[in-house]
């Protein structure tokens, strides 16, 4: 039985767990054993950790715990997308979304309850900011999803044979701005990359930021993973309106930070995300302006059809306009994709990550028609 003041071991990356074991008078290799039990074998208590000395297990039972986030709901979309609503206490909830594809499984992870950036097109921002998530609450989303998915597929973990993982990619693109919760996000990502935990490569962990320039530089120095930048506008005047953070870190400063990041990044390009808003940022002239502002940054574009919500006052760009916009970028030789909408029926699509969902109206009813979303790729 653990005490009310016990340490949650999910809050520790490898270095932190070594230090904690050291405080108990244990050698560093015990931390690796413990980490494998927690993150690879899904151990929920210490008694079953049979290769740990009994004396250590007794110490841990009195001083430590493995506390997972509480699942409030679990929904599966008709397209296979799975969304968990996670209760993080005091009326706050965050969401975790798994997107299955033929060759990979991507988990979208939240970093904050709410968001302070308040992008005009994002329903999460309309909730306002509640608090940062802890490292345990962030890595707990991956642990929860990985083992829930393994269980549904009959892939039981265990020390006698590590099961093939289901989550192959993680994107820090859920609720919140990850770089505004840097001190909790980075240890969680270290665990994602650690071979004694989840063993993902840096190319398979992507952090998405709205452009917190000083923290982009710090991330590049300390833990460069794949980077996506929420751009959404080709000039400062429009981006000031859509992404208020731009007033603090305008496009010239942001593009320079992207160039610096690429010197250490695991990929040789930045992904620029661009939410397609009808009559706001979606003309061919906007596309040409976008090419000009990003010309010195090796990049690819991910165009995101807007997911309407009542408070936004915005409309999704028409499919034919998205195609024309994309073609301008492709003709300039830039790899461009149009994100396929996934999980609309369970409000799991990009921009719909709001714990307190006020409007459960079907997306097709909001947009007037269920538009067929195209995907365009450079050849």
From Swiss-Prot:
It comes from the Bacteria. Its EC number is 2.1.1.192. One of its GO terms (molecular function) is tRNA binding. GO terms for biological process: rRNA base methylation; tRNA methylation. Residues 101-345 form the Radical SAM core domain. [4Fe-4S] cluster binds at residues 115, 119, 122. The active site is at 95 (proton acceptor), 350 (s-methylcysteine intermediate). It holds the Pfam family RlmN_N. Specifically methylates position 2 of adenine 2503 in 23S rRNA and position 2 of adenine 37 in tRNAs. m2A2503 modification seems to play a crucial role in the proofreading step occurring at the peptidyl transferase center and thus would serve to optimize ribosomal fidelity. This is Dual-specificity RNA methyltransferase RlmN. It comes from Burkholderia ambifaria (strain ATCC BAA-244 / DSM 16087 / CCUG 44356 / LMG 19182 / AMMD).
């Amino acid at each position: 039985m653990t005490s009310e003041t016990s340490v949650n071991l999910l809050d520790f990356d490898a270095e932190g767990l070594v230090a904690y074991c050291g405080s108990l008078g244990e050698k560093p290799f015990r931390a690796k054993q413990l980490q494998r039990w927690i993150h690879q074998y899904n151990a929920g208590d210490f008694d079953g950790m049979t290769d740990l000395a009994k004396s250590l297990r007794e110490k841990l039972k009195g001083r430590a715990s493995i506390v997972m986030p509480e699942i409030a709901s679990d929904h599966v979309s008709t397209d296979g997308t799975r969304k968990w609503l996670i209760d993080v206490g005091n009326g706050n909830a965050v969401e975790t979304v798994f997107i299955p594809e033929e060759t990979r499984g991507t988990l979208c992870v939240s970093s904050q309850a709410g968001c302070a950036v308040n992008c005009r097109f994002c329903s999460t921002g309309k909730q306002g900011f509640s608090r940062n998530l802890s490292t345990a609450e962030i890595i707990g989303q991956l642990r929860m999803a990985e083992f829930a998915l393994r269980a549904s597929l009959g892939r039981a973990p265990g020390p006698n044979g590590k099961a093939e993982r289901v989550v192959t990619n993680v994107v820090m693109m859920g609720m919140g701005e990850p770089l505004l919760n840097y001190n909790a996000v980075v240890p969680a990502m270290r665990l994602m990359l650690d071979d004694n935990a989840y063993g993902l490569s840096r190319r398979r962990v992507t952090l998405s930021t709205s452009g917190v320039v000083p923290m982009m530089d710090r991330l590049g120095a300390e833990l460069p993973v794949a980077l996506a930048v929420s751009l959404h506008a080709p000039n400062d005047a429009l981006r000031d309106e859509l992404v208020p953070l731009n007033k603090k870190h305008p496009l010239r400063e942001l593009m320079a930070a992207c160039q610096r990041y690429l010197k250490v990044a695991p990929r040789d390009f930045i992904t620029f995300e661009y939410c397609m808003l009808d009559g706001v940022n979606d003309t061919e002239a906007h596309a040409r302006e976008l090419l000009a502002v990003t010309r010195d940054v090796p990049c690819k574009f991910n165009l995101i059809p807007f997911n309407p919500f009542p408070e936004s006052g915005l409309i999704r760009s028409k499919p034919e306009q998205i195609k024309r916009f994309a073609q301008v970028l492709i003709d300039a030789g830039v790899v461009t994709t149009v994100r396929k909408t996934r999980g609309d029926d369970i409000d799991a699509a990009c921009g719909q990550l709001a714990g307190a969902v006020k409007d459960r109206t079907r997306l097709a009813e909001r947009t007037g028609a269920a538009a067929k979303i195209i995907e365009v790729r450079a050849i």
